[in-house]
Amino acid sequence: MTCGKPADYRYGEHTADVLIQAYGCTLEEAFVNAAVALAEVTYSTSKVEPKHSREVEVEYDDLEGLLFKWIDELLYLFDAEKFAISRKIDLKLEKDGGYRIKAVLYGDIYSQEKHGFTGLIVKAMTFHMMEIRQIGDYWMVQYVVDI
């Protein structure tokens, strides 16, 4: 989509951590790009075929807590199931008192030979430098992960 956003996502310098900024014309798109950016820290999502799917539902009172739970759930799927997400993610963000994400992630079981390895493994999500805001016509989601 075109809306003036600078990119889908980008990385910033941060020692022992990775600062991720994800962008979207909608808040949903920014959350999807935040997920793709997380995966790209470790492997190439463009090499992941959408062979399998996982349904994810997370909720929280505010957007920052929702982002934390969303990214944390993706880390769990990779750690526990070796589920590598592709760029295909169907995500719906609902506001009903609090916030809820209902998403279907498409991907495959991670294979270093098929999906590559950047040399970095994300250990944990943090609240450090977290920011979610609308900038003109697009949304920016920023967060830091420990590597």
Swiss-Prot record:
HAMAP family, alphabetized: Archease_arch
Protein name, as recorded: Protein archease
Function noted in UniProt: Activates the tRNA-splicing ligase complex by facilitating the enzymatic turnover of catalytic subunit RtcB. Acts by promoting the guanylylation of RtcB, a key intermediate step in tRNA ligation. Can also alter the NTP specificity of RtcB such that ATP, dGTP or ITP is used efficiently.
GO molecular function: calcium ion binding
Native organism: Pyrobaculum neutrophilum (strain DSM 2338 / JCM 9278 / NBRC 100436 / V24Sta)
InterPro entries for this protein: Archease, Archease_arc, Archease_dom, Archease_dom_sf
Family named by the database record: Belongs to the archease family.
Residues annotated to bind Ca(2+): D17, D146, I147
Source species taxonomy: Archaea, Thermoproteota, Thermoprotei, Thermoproteales, Thermoproteaceae
Keyword RNA-binding attributed: no
Pfam hit, one: Archease
Presence of the UniProt keyword tRNA processing in the record: yes
GO biological process, one term: tRNA splicing, via endonucleolytic cleavage and ligation
